[in-house]
């Protein structure tokens, strides 16, 4: 008995059911699908076979009456999306902020949390208002507990009235005092008008205390002013003979100044050079000392003494202006003798400024060797061991201190006190022990 043929149903893409008989009972699924694809002219590699929804291997035997469906293969991607999901899952596990996530209804957790917080705040609004009102009441109670100022007290009213009365009294007294001062000032002005000449003379005397050089052009004007005041001067000299001594001496010296200058030119030259070497303070002392002596010795009134001082100063200025032409005529052309006399006179005056033992202790300035350059510049060295303090060195003057500092090679600038202190600080020290900061910097030659 011949074996019955096996019949298989194939369902392909785009085609209906189709029955395919097999040549033998042991034919495989590959043979059936291959024959069907050849008939339909479609590639076999693009399909896979399913039977009852289950993949069938190509080597399996065909079952009779079974339905085999051809499923087309889908073109898949490169892959890698799974790795991205794994990385995102790791980040989600690490973070603690879930507000960007969504719940099962699709709402973000951020919005849900905000709604919950708003509901809680609305519930607590009444409590906050109650607490605010409680704090306001407590603040009012604290203020009411403090003692209140009573402005209706009788003591306060009485003090206010007394203060107002005192203010009115003080204003009235001030107005009365001001009016009385104005009246008294007018009366004193009318009484003192005739004596304005004396006050003007006193002011002029104060202004003429300065010593001015080069006043030869005012000789005629000064002579006329002194001639007009001779009558008043004679009366004053007769009343106070002690005060007329300096003026008389000045007049006699002024009248005989030309003869003395002609007879002894050397004395005039030495005196002229001595006056030039004096400091401004020494020049002002002769002008102020006679006035002081007059006030101490005489018991006259201040107004009379001021007029006498003024007249005496006029006579002194006249005699000085008369002596200046004689000095110019008798000046010698030799500068060396004049410089020596000036130095001797300056030393004598410095010695006279000291008192007692200090005069003996100050030695005369001794110049260094003639071969040194400092001697050519007039630099002198002092015996610092003869001075006991810096104040004694200040009496030598700025120029002497400068010369002494230059002789030692020290800085020679600064005020009188600074120079004296700098010079006194190196007393008894050798050149190696002196502070290097005190030495003057060497002068740099000009670059060619």
From Swiss-Prot:
Residues 393-427 form the SAP domain. Interacts (via PIP-box) with PCNA; the interaction is direct and prevents ultraviolet light induced monoubiquitination of PCNA. Interacts with FBL/fibrillarin. Interacts with CACTIN. Interacts with SF3B1. Interacts with U2AF1. A motif (PIP-box) lies at residues 39-52. Residues 306-315, 324-361 have a biased composition (Basic and acidic residues). Upon binding to PCNA, the N-terminal UBL (ubiquitin-like) propeptide is cleaved at Gly-77 by an unidentified deubiquitinating enzyme; the resulting mature SDE2 is degraded by the DCX(DTL) complex in a cell cycle- and DNA damage dependent manner. One of its GO terms (molecular function) is damaged DNA binding. GO terms for biological process: cell division; cellular response to UV; DNA replication; endonucleolytic cleavage of tricistronic rRNA transcript (SSU-rRNA, 5.8S rRNA, LSU-rRNA); mitotic G1 DNA damage checkpoint signaling; mRNA cis splicing, via spliceosome; protein processing; protein ubiquitination. PANTHER family: SPLICING FACTOR SF3A-RELATED (PTHR12786), SPLICING REGULATOR SDE2 (PTHR12786:SF1). The modification Phosphothreonine is found at residues 275, 324. Residues 266-277, 295-305 have a biased composition (Polar residues). Residues 109-149 form a coiled coil. The PIP-box (PCNA interacting peptide) motif mediates both the interaction with PCNA and cleavage of the SDE2 precursor by a deubiquitinating enzyme. The modification Phosphoserine is found at residues 267, 279, 332. The gene is Sde2. This is UBL fusion protein SDE2. It comes from Rattus norvegicus. Inhibits translesion DNA synthesis by preventing monoubiquitination of PCNA, this is necessary to counteract damage due to ultraviolet light-induced replication stress. SDE2 is cleaved following PCNA binding, and its complete degradation is necessary to allow S-phase progression following DNA damage. Plays a role in pre-mRNA splicing by facilitating excision of relatively short introns featuring weak 3'-splice sites (ss) and high GC content. May recruit CACTIN to the spliceosome. Its main location: nucleus. One of its GO terms (cellular component) is nucleus. Keywords: Cell cycle, Cell division, Coiled coil, Cytoplasm, DNA replication, DNA-binding, Mitosis, mRNA processing, mRNA splicing, Nucleus, Phosphoprotein, Ribosome biogenesis, RNA-binding, Ubl conjugation. It is found in: Nucleus; Cytoplasm.
